[in-house]
Structures are given as C-alpha cells and as structure tokens.
Amino acid sequence: MSKRLYPSILLATALLATGAHAASPFLKPGDEVVDHVRSRFYDPKRGEAWATKHQGYGAAATSADDFARRTQAALPELNASHTAFYPRGTTGHADLSAIFQRHLKLPKVEVPSIGADIQETPQGFFARHVFAHGPAAKAGLLRGDRLLSVEGKPFTSVASLTQRVNKPTRFTIERTLGAEPTVLTITPRLVNPKAEWLDAQHASTRVVDHQGRRVAYQQLYSCAGPEHQQKLQDALSDDFAQADAVVIDFRDGWGGCNPTFLNLFNRAVPRFVGIGRDGRRNPWSATWHKPVVLLVNGNSRSGKEIVAFTMKRLGLATLVGQHTAGAVLAGTPLRLSTGDLLYLAVEAVEVEGVLLEGVGVPVDVEVPDALPYASGKDPQLDKALDVAAAAVPSP
C-alpha cells in the first residue's frame, strides 16, 4: 500500500470515530455529568479521578434506559451520599423536583400517586408507608402488602400510572405469602409530592392511650422545608398539649431538617403558669419539655440524622428502630439538558466537630424491621410507643 494513503486512512478513521460519537445522543448528557462531578463534587481529588475515568462514557449508551443504568452504576464509585441520578419519569425525579421546585425554577410539579411509599425488594414491591386518608388507605392497602400487578400488567412503579390518573384501577396484591391474591380498586391522582407529604404528616397526627399514658405521634416522611417543622410545632402546642410524650417518625423518605428544628425541644426555655383571678392555673410552654422518642431506620438520612444525633447527645430524645443511614452531606440538584436530574454532594458537613457521613447514628433501642407481608403491623412503631409511655414520670 502506498505510504501516501496512510494519512487519508487515518483521517477517515478519525472522522468515523468522531461521527460515531456525534451520532450518540447520550454523549452530551454524559459529559454534563462528568463536568459537574469534576467541578462541583465536594472532594476534588475523588471527583477528578472519577471524571477522568468516565470521560465520554455516555457515547456508549444505546438508549435512555442504558444511559441511566451506566450512570447509576458509575456514581456509587464516588462513595458519597446525596449523589444519584434520577431520570425523568421516576419517583426520585419527581420527589427531588418537588423539594427543589423553587431552586429549579419549575412552575409546577405533579405526578401520579396512590398515597403510598412503595419499596422495591428482591422479593418484589411492598407498601412501606400507606399515607393516612390517601387513595391507597381508603382502598384498604396495608403496610407490607406486595403489589403484583396493575390492570393485569406487572407493577413497576407508581410513576408509570399516568394513563390511570382519576380512573378506578385494579391493583392485585398479595397480603400473605402464598395466599390467594386480592384485588383492590385504587384511583391514582396527580399530586405535588411535597404537598402530599405535608398532608400525610397532618393526617398522621394523633394521640393514643398506651399503657396508661397519652402518647402523641406524627410522621415526618420529609423534613425539607419550613412547612414540615411548622406543622409539628402546631401539633406540639395544640393537639399534643395534653399528651404525656411524643413519638416522631423519621423513618424513610427525605431529610432536610433545619437545625432550628431543635428549638422545638429546647428545655432552656422556661415553662410558664398563668394564674387567673379565680385562682385557676393554666400551664404553658413555648417548647416541648416532655419525653420524646425519635423513630429512625437505615433510611433516615441527612437533616434527620443531624437532629437525631444532636437530640441523643443532649439527652432530649430516645432513639428507637435501626441505625441511621450515615448520609450527611450537602447535596444540590443539577438539571441535565435531557431534563434528567443529577443529585450531587457539594459540601461535607460536620455536626459539633463530628462527621456523620458513612457513620450514622446508633439507636438506644434496636428493633429490626419486618416489612414483607406485615399485614399492617409495625413492630418498630409499637416499640416506640412502649418506650415513650415508659419514659413518662410517675405522678
């Protein structure tokens, strides 16, 4: 072969390679991920090493699903919480969009929901939290029910139910392992996830008589935003005022608690007694001074862990459940050109000189979870109520 042909062959090869990359619609979003990690990840050395290793990875993706798989497989190499990839149309994308709606400048965030948090496990999809007064609760779905199918098709995610919004929909569930499946009719609705969590928090508010004590309870599926803290503060001063103790459910969901959350339990604030002209005494306190139980598990993360760590350290609460996630970094959502979201850890966080990332917070009373086929039972909550009742001083 003539030596004069070599430059032409090399040029043609280079053009083919360039053309192959240009033809891939996933090269650009892949490069966006790499650039964000390189320039914004909280650990610059790890970020640079990861970015160098994965430069151009998007070009090999053959579909949006394949790109998502490749990205989700690569990000864990950074070994950091608050670092994940959420494609459009997924529950995580909707949740993060709702939490950071103002930051992302989104005019509206609405997704299908049945009013339940569904967990995917090796055994299948199980109802982890059934939000009080929601469509699933009204239809009879219980914690621990396994979701088998929707309108005869295998269940994949609630986010995929767009075509069933406002339509009575047949959900086939398995309540007991090996038992005959049951069909529930649930009507999915469009909701803003953050608004749904706030409604669920309010609906969960109750005071129960337990072992001779009045124990208050509220679920904070998410703590992201002042509305959630305000909702708890309102309950502590109103619905819970005559309760003897309180259980705050921090399990699963999202973090986001502001450090000012701790002010709700500041015992340095004095208690007052108003005395009327008839001599009647009316005790009042601006903060909660009675026993507190924080119910946590391996998915209690971020701001919830900061609150749990601090309240335990100061003797303000007893922790019941399971060791927390150890996911305490500051993260920010970054929108890619595809509309997908990259959630990236951008700062480390110390709490009183302690790094909780990768460490978490141990509980005072360990209670294993028992989700699959629970038939509505919740042993962790039962134990939390026991501990709260036992913490009330004798009259």
Regions found by a protein language model. Name each.
Residues 60-63, 137, 141-179, 233, ...:
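PDZ domains, with a preference for the canonical peptide-binding region formed by the helix
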Residues 165-337, 372-374, 389, 394:
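Cleft-lining beta-strand/loop regions that shape enzyme active-site pockets
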Residues 20-22:
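Boundary at the C-terminal end of the N-terminal hydrophobic targeting segment
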Residues 8-17:
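Bacterial N-terminal signal peptides
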